[in-house]
Amino acid sequence: MSKQTLILLYGGRSAEREVSVLSAESVMRAVDYNAFEVKTYFITQSGDFIKTQEFIETPGDDEKLMTNDTVEASQAIKPSDIYEEDAVVFPVLHGPMGEDGSIQGFLETLKLPYVGTNVLSSSVAMDKIMTKRILEVAGVPQVAYTVYIEGEDLEAAVAETLEKLTFPVFVKPANMGSSVGISKAENESELRSAIDLALKYDSRILIEQGVVAREIEVGILGNTTVKTTDPGEVVKDVAFYDYQAKYIDNKITMDIPARVPVEVMTQMRAYAAKAFRALGGCGLARCDFFLTEDGAIYLNELNTMPGFTQWSMYPLLWENMGLSYSDLIKELVVLGQEMFDKRESHLI
């Protein structure tokens, strides 16, 4: 039986490129090499595409994907050269220029099927402010928030925040993930500093009400038929689950399934599916919730390309549901091909 080519895109231009490499290395090891051969392409911080490695069998434990320190400039290619007939692309890219619709539009232009959400849902879900506004209309509960857009009246935005919210608040770039650029502010001075930091990453800033809550996550899989997982909980040894805690210090553990009442679990799964559909999602996503001591549920964000390492929440949630990492990848490829065929059929 001939194998299908699975193209892994990794690295990328965003501040989350290191997470992308970790995720891609996990995927390359988990792939069923009876069904796939894998070709990998590294995207540099400057946006160059580098042809890196090919695998026809499971790589050894010491095999690493080539990155900035090991890629060869002579292997740079035109981005369109990744095209291969009957291949499927897995864009294991996080953050801007990865899960914001940019790469998805590029792949659709090349007529390549790909894993994950489409152009519209990727771009909308990447922007925390747009997500908030759409989910408000959909009736999905969220914490109170204000917005600052660079070029608008900063003093007015600070005044609105002081009027509508209470400290602590969290200040977030609208279009970053993995907690990059996010700060907790306990007073007005810290709020202003947090806005300055967030502006280094984005011109659109979200300011959210801080809540004392457990962080619960639900996995989503599907296109027109949407499946969800039992929730898992992020258990932190730090006050704030930032990039350092997530990926460098490993100061978190995961409780899967989360120890929550059945009715809370059911409601979270329903909200996750509702949010996914409201944003036009397809393929996969991870929906992150806050659960307060008094039982209030707030949707925090919907991540269209969640961390995909072997220790990441998303694949572990599906493993708990009986779907192995390897079979999850197969299912995602099938869903990606299904959406490609549907897009092509609509071009009449």
Swiss-Prot record:
Its EC number is 6.3.2.4. The keyword Metal-binding applies. Pathway: Cell wall biogenesis; peptidoglycan biosynthesis. Its cofactor is Mg(2+); Mn(2+). Residues 132-334 form the ATP-grasp domain. ATP binds at residues 162-217. Binds 2 magnesium or manganese ions per subunit. It catalyses: 2 D-alanine + ATP = D-alanyl-D-alanine + ADP + phosphate + H(+). Mg(2+) 1 binds at D288, E301. GO terms for cellular component: cytosol. Coiled coil: none annotated. One of its GO terms (molecular function) is metal ion binding. One of its GO terms (biological process) is cell wall organization. Keywords: ATP-binding, Cell shape, Cell wall biogenesis/degradation, Cytoplasm, Ligase, Magnesium, Manganese, Metal-binding, Nucleotide-binding, Peptidoglycan synthesis. It is found in: Cytoplasm. Cell wall formation. Belongs to the D-alanine--D-alanine ligase family. NCBIfam families: D_ala_D_alaTIGR (TIGR01205), PRK01966.1-4 (NF002528), PRK01966.1-5 (NF002529). This is D-alanine--D-alanine ligase.
